[in-house]
Amino acid sequence: MALAVAPEQKEFVAHRVLLLARAYAYRADRSHAVFLVEGKTGVGMALWRDCGQENAYILDDLFIDARYQGRGYGTAALALILEGLRREGKFPRVILRYVEGNDAARKFYERSGFRRNFHDFEDEIEMELTL
């Protein structure tokens, strides 16, 4: 599946191979790496996992291929992921980080209710959402 983000987004998003490697590394934390598809067409990928230490789910990655951005796929995928986590009910919140300066990511996650929690790490801004 040839997925790629826009050139200006490359510094902010992990390559899909790294996403899969991260899923394997976090397999003990019930990691979930998924391809996002419309019909038979791959439009993106996502990765999330459990984090008992934080009493939260961690959304490690969510990206939509550059050719399909702006069509609502990211919003729909995030809504489905969050609904599944709410139904599961193992943890009360979701935590994510985005690279400082990635205003598109910040705005995207804010529209879905995520708020900065000021537990930032190096050049990454941490946000969370109460389920």
Language model feature labels by segment:
Residues 1-60, 65-67, 78-88, 116-122:
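Acetyl-CoA-dependent GNAT
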Residues 65-71, 100-101:
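Active-site acidic-Proline motif in GNAT/NAT acetyltransferases
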Residues 80, 107-108:
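Structural preference for long, well-ordered alpha-helical segments within the folded cores
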Residues 85-97:
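Conserved GNAT acetyl-CoA-binding A-motif
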Residues 95-106, 122-124:
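Conserved beta-strand-loop-alpha-helix junction that forms the acyl-donor binding cleft
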Residues 109, 114:
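Conserved active-site tyrosine of GNAT-family acetyltransferases
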Residues 126-131:
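Terminal substrate-recognition subdomain of acyl/acetyltransferases
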